[in-house]
């Protein structure tokens, strides 16, 4: 089994990588993993999580290994990784919710459940339904009209404090 963490420093209101990298290392050590058992990547641009996930899934498949990926970011980072591993039966994707919307988390559980690294590393896989659209893969919601316009504009405003 191979493990990969994809961290998006641009997701949410603040960069999650500073606090999360040491937490991941500590949780991995508690799980009995060596540093060679897992990889942590920080995404650098839109689409990077998809590229990293696809490359890792291909490499694991060629080696006959399974791959478990966790994304730390928002729904966009999660969906990039889901799209990247699409078609690879050896790969599973988990979500650490550090984005601004986190629709996936609200659909399937609570923030406490999803941010518990020990539980995430020890947990099993759960199959969910996804929907393929002309614009990509969806695991929670597809919207048109006002909802879509609001979602499209969020990157411009996500780090502006509301109060």
Question: Each predicted region: which residue ranges?
Answer:
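Glycine-rich beta-strand-to-loop/alpha-helix junction loops that act as flexible
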Residues: 9, 72-74, 96-98
């Amino acid at each position: 089994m191979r493990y990969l963490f994809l961290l998006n420093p641009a997701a949410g209101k603040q960069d999650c990588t500073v606090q999360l990298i040491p937490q991941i290392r500590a949780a991995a050590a508690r799980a009995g993993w060596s540093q060679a058992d897992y990889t942590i990547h920080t995404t650098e641009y839109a689409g990077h999580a998809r590229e990293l996930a696809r490359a890792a899934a291909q490499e694991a498949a060629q080696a006959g290994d399974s791959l478990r990926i966790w994304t730390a970011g928002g729904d966009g980072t999660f969906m990039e990784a889901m799209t990247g591993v699409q078609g690879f039966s050896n790969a599973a994707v988990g979500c650490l919710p550090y984005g601004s919307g986190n629709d996936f988390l609200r659909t399937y559980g609570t923030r406490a459940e999803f941010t518990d690294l020990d539980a995430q590393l020890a947990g099993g896989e759960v199959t969910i339904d996804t929907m393929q659209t002309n614009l990509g893969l969806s695991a929670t919601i597809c919207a048109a009209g006002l909802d879509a316009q609001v979602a499209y504009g969020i990157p411009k405003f996500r780090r502006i404090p509301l109060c």
